[in-house]
Amino acid sequence: MIHVIAVITAKPGMREKILEAARANVPAVKAEDGCIEYSLTVDAEGMGSFQTKFGADTFVFVEKWRDPAALKAHAGAPHMAAYAAKVKDLIATRVIHVMSPADK
């Protein structure tokens, strides 16, 4: 299994436009072969002082993929290219972490 944490920060004033495009893309991603989880998340409220927030303009995709081949196919999917084209000028930063389970 492959895990992905993708942290996206919007340029000022662009948060809602990115979220709209991302939300519209989620069903196509979840339908991909090998997609186990694909969740669009934002900071939880009311979690207390132990939480380190990303901030209002940042959201995180939490993903699980069956294997590296499924993740690579996802990255090359036409709907991902269309999503990237819609949001490329709206994003301030994008950091993608790809990880393997450490508890094997």
Where are these regions (language model features)?
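Catalytic cores of transferase enzymes with a strong primary signal for eukaryotic protein kinases
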Residues: 60, 75-77, 98, 102
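Glycine-rich beta-strand-turn "strand-cap" elements at beta-sheet edges
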Residues: 39-54, 82-104
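Short, well-ordered beta-strand segments in beta-rich or mixed alpha/beta enzyme
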Residues: 2-9, 41-75
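Amphipathic repeat-derived elements
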Residues: 1-15, 90-101
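Short amphipathic alpha-helical segments
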Residues: 14-40, 79-83, 87
